[in-house]
Amino acid sequence: MEGNLIKINKWLYPVSWLYGTGVWLRNKLFDWGIYKERKFDVPIISVGNITVGGTGKTPHTEYLIRLLQKDYKVAVLSRGYKRKSKGFVLAGPDTSVQMIGDEPFQMKQKFPDIYMAVDRNRCHGIEQLCNSHIAPGTEVIILDDAFQHRYVKPGMNILLVDYHRLICEDALLPAGRMREPENGKSRAHIVIVTKCPKDITPMDLRVLSKQMELYPYQQLYFTTLAYGKLHPLFTVCLLYTSPSPRDRSLS
């Protein structure tokens, strides 16, 4: 398995230590029951990560939708990043991208039969989706990017980890890209290593499994991206930072 080059700014370790102390204390307040986690009667699946940047969250959320919508009425709740609206918004036929944000809008276009909602307050959003007058028949809710939102206690926590930036090799913000210490992975029921190369070997998988150091109650999976049929397009890149899966597929 080829080594992954992870840029860590060691000069920022003191700041990362302060940040990590704050995150550790916040998590402990939840663990001790001082901050309350709320359970709901409806099944809730959380999909998220503990690093900033893309880990393939959208395609994995869409996979869950395809898997579940055959038998259940699915609702997806997102924060609605960069939207112009406030509070709870349930997407409908006339909902614009400005009202719910780019990714929720695209998801609703792709899966018109699901409930697609946004709300910064996840507990309030779940309450609305459980209201039979607002979203009748909701049977399962998928929380988008909610691994750190501990006010909700999901029935299943799915943690996504980028193959090219394993959490066991990363550091806390701002020295690295981790939102919380690595032991935060203990809250996950399922851990998925995403963006694996298609030619990854069984030996590589065994090495990765050992590096992840998961608990017996956790399940580990590996996924790769499969791109669809190519279509002619014109791309203009105004700002380039680091290669995304899209950039690598275009190159």
Task: Annotate each PLM feature.
Residues 131, 233-239:
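Short, surface-exposed amphipathic charged segments that create phosphate/polyanion-binding patches used
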Residues 34-82, 88:
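Walker A (P-loop) phosphate-binding motif
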Residues 220-230:
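Beta-strand-loop-alpha "switch" segments that mediate conformational coupling across diverse proteins
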Residues 81, 86-110, 114-212:
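Phosphate/Mg2+-binding loops and adjacent switch elements
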Residues 1-40:
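A transmembrane-helix-recognition feature enriched in membrane-embedded lipid enzymes
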Residues 73-74, 157, 220:
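Hydrophobic anchor at the start of a short beta-strand
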